[in-house]
């Protein structure tokens, strides 16, 4: 392996590990991801640092918590005074490419051009700000706001085609490349091609004990059209379609003779409740929203392995800089996961912190959720004995030790990460559109 590999980072939107066969959910068909996992390192427990799009993306690019970047909700812009992963890799001699959904320019949540000064340092940018209605009829831009590129057919297919062309351009450059490919799928509203939808119609998709078939919907206009069963048919079909596109992308990587010197990482910004606990969407601290897939194939790796190393969003920037032999400005949090990707043992017990409308502290076994953005505990779950999080152990006398331990961890984190002069009431947490 060359010392400085290319890096292909594939980010999908609203795909929880809970819904993938790689993580034990056999109702969904994802053969390409299964094949990729079989030759990669699968992190069994990866936790998003924020279960919402913009805060997550700010964390990914900065290596810092939302409370440190100020990106606490959707519709905010990546701060100009924060260096990004692209900046660090540019300094390390990489060509940096971004393809797909951005959601970091502060513009309204719609399909629009992203100006160069809002691109967080990426040298080559082919993307758009936010949503395309039902994954069809989308537009994507390079540098001219008046020259939009139409994405015919389904957005996932068109975006994959664009990414494969961009890969060929990147491969021709003398410098190593970093490409962040950001899919919007399987973010609802879902409209998978018929062939993928048919795989799930007329099948019972309501197997979990924490499901609520009459679940409350965040989006009022979905109520008339979806029940949990129908939502899952569409959502799972979107996952299978995305899986097929990911397989095409990997085959193109092989055709370009890039496999032996390219680190490939597949992950998601957050999960999807899909009717669990009577909820849809994200923005909460249940496992369906927090637990994301994280699968990494090191350059030249061909044998799969699984690691119990607890991973978090803030680990991704230091991991990629470790492979690239790059340096940050010392402000990034997290730890490099390179040792585990290369087959090393887990580094031991740690606490992963997540934040949005609540704070949450997670270990391999326990999860503590606060009441709003305070340190008042609201729920404590034993993830090993109660994987569907049906029994709140907060007031169980036998669970006082993990409650105290995680409460102290949150207190230390808050003192370190949350700016004391920030007026958080201005964010109106219950009104945020996610």
Residue ranges and their predicted role:
Residues 1-372, 376-378, 387-434:
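Formylglycine-dependent sulfatase
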Residues 384:
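Residues forming the ATP-binding cleft of Hanks-type serine/threonine protein kinase domains
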């Amino acid at each position: 392996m060359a010392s400085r590999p290319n890096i292909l980072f594939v980010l999908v939107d609203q795909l929880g590990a809970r819904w993938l066969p790689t993580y034990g959910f056999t109702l969904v068909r994802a053969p390409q991801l299964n094949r990729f996992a079989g030759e990669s390192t699968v992190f069994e427990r990866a936790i998003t640092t924020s279960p919402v799009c913009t805060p997550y993306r700010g964390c990914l690019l900065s290596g810092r918590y939302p409370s440190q970047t100020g990106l606490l909700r959707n519709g905010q812009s990546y701060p100009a005074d924060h260096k990004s992963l692209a900046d660090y890799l540019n300094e390390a001699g990489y060509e940096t490419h971004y393809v797909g959904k951005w959601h970091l320019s502060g513009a309204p949540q719609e399909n629009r051009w992203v100006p160069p000064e809002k691109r967080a340092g990426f040298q080559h940018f082919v993307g758009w700000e936010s949503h395309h209605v039902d994954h069809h009829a989308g537009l994507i831009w390079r540098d001219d706001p008046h020259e939009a590129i139409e994405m015919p057919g389904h957005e996932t297919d068109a975006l994959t085609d664009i990414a494969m062309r961009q890969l060929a351009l990147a491969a021709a450059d003398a410098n190593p490349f970093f490409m962040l490919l950001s899919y919007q799928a399987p973010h609802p509203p879902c409209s998978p091609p018929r062939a993928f939808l048919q795989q799930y119609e007329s099948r019972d998709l309501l197997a979990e004990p924490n499901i609520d078939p009459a679940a409350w919907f965040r989006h009022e206009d979905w109520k008339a059209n979806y029940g949990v069963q129908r939502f899952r048919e569409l959502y799972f079909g979107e996952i299978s379609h995305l899986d097929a596109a990911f397989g095409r992308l990997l085959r193109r990587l092989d055709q370009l003779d890039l496999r032996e010197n390219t680190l490939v990482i597949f992950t998601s910004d957050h999960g999807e409740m899909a009717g669990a606990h009577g909820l849809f969407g994200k923005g909460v601290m249940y496992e369906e929203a927090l637990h994301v897939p994280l699968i990494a194939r090191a350059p030249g790796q061909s044998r799969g392995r699984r690691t119990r190393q607890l991973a978090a969003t803030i680990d991704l920037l230091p991991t990629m800089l470790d492979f690239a032999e790059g340096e940050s400005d010392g402000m990034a949090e997290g730890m490099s996961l390179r040792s585990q990707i290369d087959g090393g043992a887990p580094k031991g017990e740690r606490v992963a912190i997540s934040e949005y409308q609540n704070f949450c502290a997670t270990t391999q076994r326990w999860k503590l959720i606060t009441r709003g953005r305070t340190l008042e505990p609201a729920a404590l779950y034993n993830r090993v004995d109660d994987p569907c999080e049906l029994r709140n152990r907060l007031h169980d006398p036998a669970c006082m030790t993990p409650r105290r331990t995680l409460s102290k961890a949150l207190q230390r984190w808050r003192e370190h990460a949350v700016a004391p002069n920030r007026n958080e009431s201005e964010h109106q947490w219950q009104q945020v559109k996610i």
